[in-house]
Amino acid sequence: NKIIARSHNLCEKLIDFTAHAEMQVFTSASNYLQSKYLDKCSLYVTLEPCLMCAGASYWTRIGKIVFGANDPKKGFRNKSTNVLHPKTTIIGPIMEMECSSIIKSFFSDKR
């Protein structure tokens, strides 16, 4: 019950397509815990993770992912193959309208 890492999308700032919030958090949390496995951790994100971030979550063995808004274009659930670790619990969408509004505002300011 402790926040050990937080971030936001840094793709524009770092000019790096892999600098999604999830990727930043996985690195920070792993450094904090001194472990590449995050099986006792939960990830809370505003938008459904993309395929890249979901794939990275597989390798971290993250315990739970909670997301706010669906991502009908790039979300990992649009793929026929489940890319999450079998022990990862997924919860979402939750507070979808609020989260969609936050995402739209964030990206309109960045792009």
Q: For the regions a protein language model found, what residue spans apply to each?
A:
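A short, polar/charged loop-to-alpha-helix boundary motif
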Residues: C11-Q24
